Amino acid sequence: MPACLLFAQHGWADTHDRIADLTARVAPPEAMRIAPNLGYVRTWLRIEPLIADVETIATATLAQFPDLPVSVIGHSMGGLIWIEILSRHPEWWPRMTAFVLLGSPVDGSHYSRMADPMGLGVGIARDLGISRTDKAERLAQAMPMLSIAGAINCNGDHAVPLDATTFEGDTDVVVHGVDHPGLLDSPHVDAVARHFLARRTPRPLPPSPVIRTLRSVAGMTAGDRAKYCGARLELMFEDGHQLLTIDSRVTRSHVFLVDHEHHCRFAGYVGPIHRGDLWRAIATLREEYADRLLGPSP
């Protein structure tokens, strides 16, 4: 007998394989995992038949296990499918313990609007260009919701802008250095989703000790905070703070501390002669805050 139900839904131009693998990595123990395959070709056509298929599977599964709590993970369009399903089934809301969106264009896909600017019905573009922010905000009042977005630059994951993924009432996490498909393979995304599904309360990180450690590095010089866009994620703290780097063996190596609201709290750099000192400081932080970090160890 499973302890809970975890539905996972793939998105546009995809099948269920990768999100099923992700679900296996992040699911709570003894969870029953359901990852319907909607078919690659069908994801290019209309969203309503896809919603109907997933709704049928969910209805049957929830009826079979009427007392089990329910969680959902949806990647991109998969998250939109579940926003529609849950909006139509408020009787399921009391059973929902977590709804995780991975790069879902809740406010509408800008590429879809470009492909179908008049809303004439050009394939799936019409359906993905619609804003579902109002529906998502109503759901967020009834259940815990997490929106994880990738960021290759400060605008988004090369497919979905950051501003399209956020809405009132959600927990908003941006994972730097991850593009749209990479949300399904990132160990840091896995860790954030696993932490949320387990309903753990993140402990806040006082940034001052971290900043003091970085400032104490030999040769550290104040840098340009705007440069953190496109930097590599090194450490992700459970409260959303992230330590990012731009590393170079021949010029300057930059380090940034960014908070959960995407504000850069520290920016600095060292020259090649002090590069080793910087990486030793990062290793020290990794050890000191090991119990507050999400994601893989090197």
Regions found by a protein language model. Name each.
Residues 1-5:
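A short, charged/proline- and glycine-enriched loop
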Residues 6-12, 16-17, 21, 26-27, ...:
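Serine-dependent carboxylesterase/thioesterase catalytic core
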Residues 140-298:
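C-terminal catalytic-base region of ester-bond hydrolases, centering on the histidine
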